[in-house]
């Protein structure tokens, strides 16, 4: 039986930290679904279609990654995709409490859904999409934190 995992997030935009997690997940699971949440309440900078396209290009070198957008409840999405593993990145202790609440709720909604937490590599442990966008808005150099295609899209968006 194939091990199918979902790595959900807003990915507004996808960063090298996200790529670190998804790349490592591809070594642990047969199929990884990078599930990009519509998240209209977060007022994303990039549309869902833009985020999906950026992530598809950034992960094209990974053979077992599928990038899809979604707006459903995560447990329902996982059930529909026949996945029973959720991958979540934990940057710091501050992330853990929220992630624990999500894991418990997801397990309540779908008892066979396991959450697997991965720590990003030290190089990426302090970055987030929000922080990268904020630095870029103030003309800070964020080249190191983003895949090339995403960096260009962010610069174009901020013009």
Curated annotation (Swiss-Prot):
Homohexamer. SUPFAM superfamilies: Nucleotidylyl transferase. It holds the Pfam family CTP_transf_like. GO terms for biological process: coenzyme A biosynthetic process. NCBIfam families: coaD_prev_kdtB, cyt_tran_rel. The record marks 18 as: Transition state stabilizer. It catalyses: (R)-4'-phosphopantetheine + ATP + H(+) = 3'-dephospho-CoA + diphosphate. Pathway: Cofactor biosynthesis; coenzyme A biosynthesis; CoA from (R)-pantothenate: step 4/5. Substrate binds at residues 10, 42, 74, 88. ATP binds at residues 10-11, 18, 89-91, 99, 124-130. It is an enzyme of class 2 (transferase). The lineage of its organism: Bacteria, Pseudomonadati, Pseudomonadota, Gammaproteobacteria, Enterobacterales. Coiled coil: none annotated. This is Phosphopantetheine adenylyltransferase. It is found in: Cytoplasm. It comes from the Bacteria. Its EC number is 2.7.7.3.
């Amino acid at each position: 039986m194939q091990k199918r995992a979902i790595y959900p997030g807003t990915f507004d935009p996808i960063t090298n930290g996200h790529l670190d997690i998804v790349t490592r997940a591809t070594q642990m699971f047969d199929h990884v679904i990078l599930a990009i949440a519509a998240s209209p309440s977060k007022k994303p900078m990039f549309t869902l279609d833009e985020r999906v396209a950026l992530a598809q290009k950034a992960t094209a070198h990974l053979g077992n990654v599928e990038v899809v957008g979604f707006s459903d409840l995560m447990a329902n999405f996982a059930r529909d995709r026949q996945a029973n593993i959720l991958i979540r990145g934990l940057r710091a202790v501050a992330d853990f409490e929220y992630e624990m609440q999500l894991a418990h709720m997801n397990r309540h909604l779908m008892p066979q859904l396991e959450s697997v937490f991965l720590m990003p590599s030290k190089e990426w442990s302090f970055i987030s999409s929000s922080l990268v966008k904020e630095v870029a808005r103030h003309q800070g150099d964020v080249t190191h934190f983003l895949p090339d295609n995403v960096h260009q899209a962010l610069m174009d968006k901020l013009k």
